[in-house]
Amino acid sequence: MGKKQKNKSEDSTKDDIDLDALAAEIEGAGAAKEQEPQKSKGKKKKEKKKQDFDEDDILKELEELSLEAQGIKADRETVAVKPTENNEEEFTSKDKKKKGQKGKKQSFDDNDSEELEDKDSKSKKTAKPKVEMYSGSDDDDDFNKLPKKAKGKAQKSNKKWDGSEEDEDNSKKIKERSRVNSSGESGDESDEFLQSRKGQKKNQKNKPGPNIESGNEDDDSSFKIKTVAQKKAEKKERERKKRDEEKAKLRKLKEKEESETGKKDQSKQKESQRKSEEETVKSKVTLDTGVIPASEEKAETPTAAEDDNEGDKKKKDKKKKKGEKEEKEKEKKKGPSKATVKAMQEALAKLKEEEERQKREEEERIKRLEELEAKRKEEERLEQEKRERKKQKEKERKERLKKEGKLLTKSQREARARAEATLKLLQAQGVEVPSKDSLPKKRPIYEDKKRKKIPQQLESKEVSESMELCAAVEVMEQGVPEKEETPPPVEPEEEEDTEDAGLDDWEAMASDEETEKVEGNTVHIEVKENPEEEEEEEEEEEEDEESEEEEEEEGESEGSEGDEEDEKVSDEKDSGKTLDKKPSKEMSSDSEYDSDDDRTKEERAYDKAKRRIEKRRLEHSKNVNTEKLRAPIICVLGHVDTGKTKILDKLRHTHVQDGEAGGITQQIGATNVPLEAINEQTKMIKNFGRENVRIPGMLIIDTPGHESFSNLRNRGSSLCDIAILVVDIMHGGEPQKMKPTNLPKPKKCPFMVALNKIDRLYDWKKSPDSDVAATLKKQKKNTKDEFEERAKAIIVEFAQQGLNAALFYENKDPRTFVSLVPTSAHTGDGMGSLIYLLVELTQTMLSKRLAHCEELRAQVMEVKALPGMGTTIDVILINGRLKEGDTIIVPGVEGPIVTQIRGLLLPPPMKELRVKNQYEKHKEVEAAQGVKILGKDLEKTLAGLPLLVAYKEDEIPVLKDELIHELKQTLNAIKLEEKGVYVQASTLGSLEALLEFLKTSEVPYAGINIGPVHKKDVMKASVMLEHDPQYAVILAFDVRIERDAQEMADSLGVRIFSAEIIYHLFDAFTKYRQDYKKQKQEKFKHIAVFPCKMKILPQYIFNSRDPIVMGVTVEAGQVKQGTPMCVPSKNFVDIGIVTSIEINHKQVDVAKKGQEVCVKIEPIPGESPKMFGRHFEATDILVSKISRQSIDALKDWFRDEMQKSDWQLIVELKKVFEII
């Protein structure tokens, strides 16, 4: 037994040392314990079990010998529910340990059996004791946290003290506490008691018999000191440590991320070097000084997991530690040697160097990172700007499409797609689907309604199919939600960037998913970034140089292959830069435009065609041949009746002017003058080198001269290369004579002046076969003087316009001085000189302008219906060439018309294009020519706008848009009124002329149209019958009126005025308006009451009653026959109606303000006659009795007869009569 006790005491000392080490660990690195609370608890439980087992053996041996065993058992029964049973037994038995050591062996077997019983009782316990065990372990922790020094002192004192006193005290305390528990005191006290018991048990376990008392004293003192505040403080301390640890972890994570973005390998190498160096330094330090660094001490402390495994090795470790300590103490006594000091110094120097090197590297790394960050920010900024530009372009594109009416909503796009699908289906089934343009314009056939049912059925089928497909896609999407690729964490930025087009982005994402999941069902779109590139290219082509345009075009021609390569490159970039934000942005931009791919196939084709057209135009502008000249377009301008057409007639030997309505040109005509005719006309000019003529001929355009046709003049002079301004030498200072000179100036068109009608000079002798300069010399002196005088006057007028002018034979500088050519269209004098000058000027000054160019430029001048040919268009071909069979796009009333050229007709040389001739048919026509084009659907063509040729089918929509833009500009200039006449003309030019004329004449127009008058035009005009019947009129200028339209107009009451001359039309309309007004005035003359105010002259009362005849002064307004009079001052008494007015015994209809007249006032029929002196006095003012109806009648039909003062009087009388 003695041996056993000795062994046990040794074990307890070892445990004591162990606990000391643990306490040190807790003080140094309490955080580690908190990190793994569960492990530590498990460890303590195991330790507790071992200790309980050792103590149970001893105590149960002592239990049999003790005298107070029975009393303790009774106590145990009272506290059966509590887990303090064993503890009480242990404490009571320990009190009697020394008394009963002899009977230990005898009762050893009994103790074993009791031990088994105790274990069974422990297993039967509920969860409550477990919780108390944990509480006990917490107290143990508290105990372990006590400082080392205090414990050491306590141990030393324990060796000296005797344990008997402590045993007695313990037994007393146990009894008292058991009584408290049995008497049912509060549970808190029992808990405290249990904790104290467990603490004491720990002390007993840690220290052998002689040290029991001091341990208990320590325990008691620890429990006394530990208040609630202390516990809270400790808890706070633990929480703080936890927070510190979390922060440290976060820091580590951040450092890791930074190191990952940087060069990982270098950082690892540095760390490994640093660690190795530190270890070497530490090992040297420990060897030299014997001082273990705190970090190593911490490392040496065993973890909770190691403690379980190292339970058996504790003894050996402790012995080793003791040995080490002794060695260290010896080394300390000796002190460090010189070698060690030197080694330490070297190590420190190395450390310093290493630290400096690391510092430098760290600074370099930070600098690099900063540079990278700056670079990244710059890239982000550029990317942002790029995105904003794209957004702006997209916005502009959408606005453009919106303006053009091409911006479709999702539903519209779907509808279009369905329609396209139905068309394809019809074509697949073999049904011929004619194109919109190729359909012949026919009268409506009622079979169409039946035909429409077939496509509707097919469309419904198509809709159902598309619905099924959509449903399938949705099912697939629902079925595979896990596979959705989560976008990188730059999503919020992406959302910010695409706020404007947010909906498009979501659509794009959906479309991306669909393409990934349902590749079989969906159409695979090869080109992702194409629409965006095309947008950019389109803008760049407008702004950048030609070379860039060519490169882009080449890139475009490569097609989908190049785009796929681009995609691969972008994919590689994405994989390379995972942490960079750029790829995600690229993806976002892709996704933005992916959604466009479905709906912008047409747009892509449109852009491609647009670029092709632009490139072709550029190439043509480069390949200009200055050696080969085209025929110049010569425009004849001038005032009406100056003889423009007559000059051309003389040139052509025709009589066009005689055939014109009223001898006035109202349309633009064109004449081709061949080279032979030029040579013929200029044969009398001596210095004219016929061999040097490079131009193939001339195209002369005749324009109307009247002011109302200024737009036609404008149109003509915009085409022409050089202009002839015809001025009548006999009439100076005409309003329009100098006006045409303003036309060529803004157009930068050179011009020359023909001083026409020189044959009107007195005693002029004609000589058409000689030069005009020679002819002038042959004239008499008086004729010469008159000519010079008139010519000088015209030169002065030009000078007033800011132009230098001189007679052509005196002009030495044609660039600065305008040449004046005296001509006579009647006799033919000066015509040769005129043509000679034209040829000279065009060849010398306009060679670049006349250089041959393949780029087509043509203008529609007139639209004419010819018998046997249908509707034809007269076109001035300025540049390029036209071939039979070309697809042309011409402007139309209801939009651009696409048609094929059926025939190209040219009038014979020297014949007017607009006059019916025996036309010559050509397969191809070169510029410059006046051509008549035959084709389908040309009825609604608008004159005055360009004609375009589409060489490929995809160019048609681009050219259509160009024409629509042109047409919008011209029609926006025409502003319609709510009330007004309906105007129809044969051409856009004449329509504009007529509208200009109506505007100056203050005639409002509510509707316009070009072409013959149909029933629909009459219907439109009839709307005015409801608003204002005087404007229910159609002014038809130079157009045919359909018979059914005339019949309908007659039945509805719409007047149609038709005339071939603009002035006749206007005269007819003004006459109609006047007649209509007279009718209305006659109708409303009894309702309309003119305002007047009269003062009675009391000395001129000729008859006071029935009728009242008296003299009055008109104070305001005007008195007319039939004006009802009343007296406002006498309760508005009606005195009668003015039947006659006399001035100086002469009867008049009206008496104005300030006149003294005699009036005869007859009583109102059916009323008693009023009397002067009874019903009204001489002091009373007489006024005309007005009403709302009378005021309206005056406004509508008698406005011309009213003056401003009359309207002011009406306002005054309205207040008197309280008229609203």
From Swiss-Prot:
Basic and acidic residues bias locations: 7-16, 170-179, 231-282, 323-334, 349-417, 434-449, 570-588, 598-608
Required cofactor(s): a monovalent cation
GO molecular function: GTP binding; GTPase activity; metal ion binding; translation initiation factor activity
InterPro entries: EFTU-type, P-loop_NTPase, Small_GTP-bd, T_Tr_GTP-bd_dom, TIF_IF2, TIF_IF2_dom3, TIF_IF2_dom3_sf, Transl_B-barrel_sf
A Pfam entry, by short name: GTP_EFTU
Presence of keyword Cytoplasm: yes
GO cellular component entries: mitochondrion
Coiled coil: none
CDD domains: aeIF5B_II, IF2_aeIF5B_IV, IF2_eIF5B
Broad EC category: hydrolase
Annotated positions of the Phosphothreonine modification: T301, T498
Phosphoserine sites (modified residues): 66, 107, 113, 135, 137, 164, 171, 182-183, 186, 190, 214, 222, 438, 547, 557, 560, 588-589, 591, 595, 1168
Chain positions covered by the region annotation G5: 824-826
Main location: cytoplasm
Domain tr-type G: 629-846
Chain intervals for the UniProt region annotation (G1): 638-645
Compositional bias ranges of the Acidic residues kind: 109-118, 491-516, 531-569
Composition-biased stretches (Basic residues): 95-105, 146-158
Stated family: Belongs to the TRAFAC class translation factor GTPase superfamily. Classic translation factor GTPase family. IF-2 subfamily.
Protein name stated in the entry: Eukaryotic translation initiation factor 5B
Organism expressing this protein natively: Pongo abelii
Gene name tied to this protein: EIF5B
